[in-house]
Every structure is written in C-alpha cells, then in structure tokens.
Amino acid sequence: MSSAAEYQLNPYLGWQKEQGIPIHTGFFVEDLRKVRLGFWKGRNANGAFINLSNAVVNDAVVLEVPPGEKTVPRRQLFDESVMVVEGQGATSMWYEDGRKKTFEWQQGSVFAIPPNVWHEHYAMSAPARLVSCTSAPLYMQLFNNNDFIFNCDYKFLDRYAEEENYFVESPQLLRGFKGIETNFIADVRQWFTRENVYALEEKGGFRQSRDRAST
C-alpha cells in the first residue's frame, strides 16, 4: 500500500490518483477478468491500475471499452504492450500528419504500441477488456513533465515508419535466445503450442539456449 507521502513524492503515483479510477496493489492478480474497474473519463472507458509490489519501472493498466465505443485518442512517449483479455475489436494508429492504419484483434491477441504514435481502441458488439504493461512509472519519474510525455511530436521512425505490414503476425526468431520478436500476435494462447515450439527448435531457436543452460 502506497502512503500519502509517496503519492506526493512520486510523480507517477500522483498522476495515477488524478485519473480517478481504482488502484489495485499486492503481489498478484488472480483473475484480470474480474478486476474492479471505474469509469476513466480521460480514456472514455472503464479502467484500473495494478501496482504490483516492488514494481517501480513498469505498471499494468486494465482498460475495458464498452460495446460499440472507442477510446479517446492518445499518444505517449513510453512503451506499451497490450494483451486482449476478453472481447474483439480494433486499434487505429497514426502520426500527427500521417494516415491511419487499423488492425483487428481478439481474445488472446498481443500487440505493441510504438512511442509517440496516436492510437485509439474500438470494441465490437461486446465489452473488450485489455491489459497493458507500460514503462510510464520510469518516464514520469525521469522527466516529471506529463505535457512532454503525452504531447511530444517526435517520430521514432526506427520504431514505426508506417510500414504496411507492421501489424501483421510475422514473428522473427531470435537465434540463440528463447524467444521471438514481433509487433503483433493474433492469439498468444495458440502460438506457443508444442507444435510451434518444435518448429522453432528445428530452426535452431530454442535448442541453443537449452544446450547452454545444461552445460
């Protein structure tokens, strides 16, 4: 539990409190589908923060978009990775003077939001619940200037250059490392099946790290 003094000294905790939505603390969350939410006016959605114990660099945010609604467009300097807990919908992303690119997602989808890119989420006929992991705590404590964090127009073209296939599932194998690199996974529950792991091993993806660990 964060004290009143911590909220005054920590820019991120102070910003959290200003959003007016529940802040859950502790060592774990048993079921993200059942986390209590509150209306987040700044996002036009229901939301909650999750402050896991001793997590000072990253945070977790639960966002539930009502059926047929969309979130308020936002951009931010920090990184954000999103997983769809429930529902179906779509996300649009664009630079200030660029063209919108929209991709669809479903339960189990995982995608990354590049820094300083405008984005908004849409829900289809049922509520869509998303959980995000961001580096907002680090950035807010580092800069202590939310206008800069949420209104910087610098384009990180090395991260996102408006490529047509940016949000297409096309994982790149990280050789010698137990993992993949991708901007979008249609359903993470299906991706890491035994068959896919074996396929990666045949390409030299996982076996190398296993061998190294066993020596």
Briefly describe each language-model feature range.
Residues 60-64, 94, 122:
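A structural feature that tracks compact, well-ordered secondary-structure segments
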Residues 66-67, 76-96, 215:
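Glycine- and acidic-residue-biased ligand/ion/polar-headgroup-sensing regions
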Residues 1-57, 155-215:
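A short, N-terminal "cap"/entry segment at the start of jelly-roll beta-barrel domains
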